[in-house]
Amino acid sequence: MNKLSVERIHKNMAAIHSKDTKPEMIVRKALWSRGFRYRLNSPKLPGHPDLVLKKYRTCIFVNGCFWHGHNVEVKSDKGEVISSECCKIPHTRREFWVAKIKRNQERDIETQKRLAEMGWHCITIWECELKPSKREQTLKSLAFTLNKIWLEEHAVIGKPYPQFEEEDGMLKAAEEQI
């Protein structure tokens, strides 16, 4: 493995932005092509969700596995960190990165709680779920979930049809034909 200089690492990290990332663009393009309309980075909602689908009362966060600690466990009693396959914690300045990722995870949980209290649904899509081998299934699942949310929100829940007593002539006639 090649060792990068501190300057090169700094340049790489500085080039990473929070908006218009490749995973976000994949999700945006897929949703738009399937007819879903959305707003980007809404400043009116906590956490500035990547995509906001007002019609579905749904916020979508497209998270990078490293920055949001996908499947990373921090054992606070010993300070041990269990890296996941898609999120490797750097060995240099490890304490800094563990603290940063843990703060990001806590912030994500708090943001989703606040959005849920406001009546919004939250969907998190991880960068590793958009790899070519999993991409189509992830995007189909996202579209299915959004349609399910819409149907649940717009379900007609009312009283069932009234049941008639046996004396009702139409009911008796219907039973006799059967």
Segment roles from a protein language model:
Residues 1-124, 128-178:
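Nucleic-acid endo/exonuclease domains
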